[in-house]
Curated annotation (Swiss-Prot):
The keyword Oxidoreductase does not apply. It comes from Schizosaccharomyces pombe (strain 972 / ATCC 24843). It comes from the Eukaryota. This is Spliceosome-associated protein 49. GO terms for molecular function: RNA binding. Keywords: Nucleus, Repeat, RNA-binding. Residues 204-223 are annotated as: Disordered. Residues 13-84, 101-172 form the RRM domain. Belongs to the SF3B4 family. GO terms for cellular component: cytosol; nucleus; precatalytic spliceosome; U2 snRNP; U2-type prespliceosome. SMART domains: RRM. The gene is sap49. The keyword Repeat applies. Pfam families: RRM_1. It is found in: Nucleus.
Length: 335
């Protein structure tokens, strides 16, 4: 089903927050529970063939609209609660606000998501941005953005007009009125109506969402200085207090069961220093020297160690020399 020019606005409801799996037939079966349905229209993207998350249903009788808003609002389709209200209310909100901007000279690569990410950073949008396209889905080079207040729209014009977007300077201004003769939105009459609505506390809520799969870009950190603190606070676990080597804080010894504690060797006055060697001792404290292996003779100790002043007394460790039985020459063993 498609939209009709002679649609009865008073007998039409607006359905928002639709899941991407919702089709015209599903919406028809749902709205049929409230009354006879004349037409179902879900605007779709010509390139991706996906809808923008909202649609319209025209009933045969105007009295069915109120009943449909009561029984269908917040009904879940594919796990998402839909939003249902009168289409005339949606039209009245847009007419009352009038903060609709025209964005021209768009690069062919600029789509609805780029417009949303760019202009949503300046204020609250009341509906998804629109890019005008031809019958083949190609961009016509302009689009529309709607804000919730004239103050935000004025700031967007001042900030974005003649700024580069996708390597092309864009033009941002108030859009022409559909029912006006060359008049643009944002005139004094619309601003007075918006001020009166704000004074009477008339709330304005967004009427649609981005196309399925589109999401606003995540803002980057404002400065590189706060990035390490954010990472440390969110992704790195706390480090336990481990005493550093050489710190003055005493560390208690480890307690291991069934193990005798190790004590360093103690030196008593009047006792000679004992050599820390695994050498068997004979009578009188002299080391036992094993006999030389066959084919080897005992060599005299080197006198160099005894001539060093202050050198500790070392036991005489035997060194052996290999005898060459063939030519009578001996070769000293590597030490």
């Amino acid at each position: 089903m498609s939209i009709r020019e002679d649609r009865n606005q008073d007998a039409t409801i607006y359905l928002g927050n639709l899941d991407e799996k919702v089709t015209d037939s599903i919406l028809f079966e749902l709205c049929l529970q409230a009354g006879p349905v004349v037409n179902i229209h879900i605007p779709r993207d010509r390139v991706r063939n996906s809808h923008n998350g909202f649609g319209f249903c025209e009933f045969l009788h105007e009295q069915d609209v109120e009943y449909a808003c009561q029984i269908l609002n917040q009904v879940k389709l594919f796990g998402k609660p839909i939003r249902v209200n009168r289409a005339s209310q949606d039209r009245g909100v847009n007419t009352l606000i009038g903060a609709n901007l025209f964005v021209g000279n768009l690069d062919p690569l600029v789509d609805e998501r780029v417009l949303y990410d760019t202009f949503s950073a300046l204020g609250q949008l009341v509906k998804a941005p629109q890019v005008a396209r031809d019958e083949n889905g190609r961009s016509k080079g302009y689009g529309f953005v709607s804000y919730d207040s004239f103050e935000t729209a004025d700031a967007a014009i001042e900030a974005m007009n003649n700024q580069f977007l996708m390597n092309k300077p864009i033009t941002v201004s108030y859009a022409f009125k559909r029912e006006g003769k060359g008049e643009r939105h944002g005139d004094i009459a619309e601003r007075k109506l918006a001020a009166a609505a704000k004074k009477n506390k008339v709330a304005v809520t967004p009427q649609s969402t981005l196309p399925p799969g589109f999401s606003p870009a995540t803002p980057a950190p404002t400065s590189a200085a706060n990035t390490p603190a954010t990472i440390a606070a969110t992704s790195i676990p706390p480090v336990p207090n481990v005493p550093l080597v050489g710190a003055t804080t005493a560390v208690p010894p480890l307690s291991i069961p069934n193990v005798l504690p190790f004590t360093a060797a103690q030196h008593f006055p009047g006792m000679p220093a004992m050599p820390m060697m695994n050498v068997p001792m004979g009578p009188g404290g002299a080391p036992l020297v094993p006999p030389p292996p066959p084919g080897m003779v005992m060599a005299s100790p080197s006198p160099a160690a005894a001539t060093i002043p202050g050198a500790p007394v070392m036991p005489n460790i035997p060194f052996y020399q290999t005898i060459n039985a063939q030519n009578g020459y001996s070769q000293q063993q590597r030490r």
